[in-house]
Amino acid sequence: MRTLTFILLLFCFVVKAQLTTNTSLTPEQLIKNILTGKGVTVSNVTYVGEADAVGEFDGSNSNIGISDGIILSTGTVLNNPGSVTNKGPVGPNNNAGASTKWNAPGDVELTNLIGDDTFDAAILEFDFIPQGDRVDFNYVFASEEY
């Protein structure tokens, strides 16, 4: 009975860790509709990277502590590339066949900082002007690379 209880508890944590991802929005739509709220003016949205390396996520059934947001990846944000809506990235990415290799350039600033090559950058940049005097945002940084 103890083994069954342990397995059921473990299964609950595994199920809880799932993100649902979606790559149907443009980078500008992601910033304006997902990241910023009322009272924020957004301009100069640029994205450099693969189309499946950026999207939105629903974290309500996960343990990351953020209900929704934008996800960027050096691989794919989808665990089934070619689909627009998905059950998110699969991890851990601990073997050579578990990631998506785009063979795309990395980030020049990171390359200069670490003194080695970087690859498959997903860079989302934008300017914003808040109407108020305070800006808050939540983020989670997760990586197999750093």
Label the model's feature ranges.
Residues 18-146:
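Aromatic (Trp/Tyr/Phe) and Gly/Pro-enriched flexible surface segments
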Residues 1-21:
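Bacterial Sec-dependent N-terminal signal peptides
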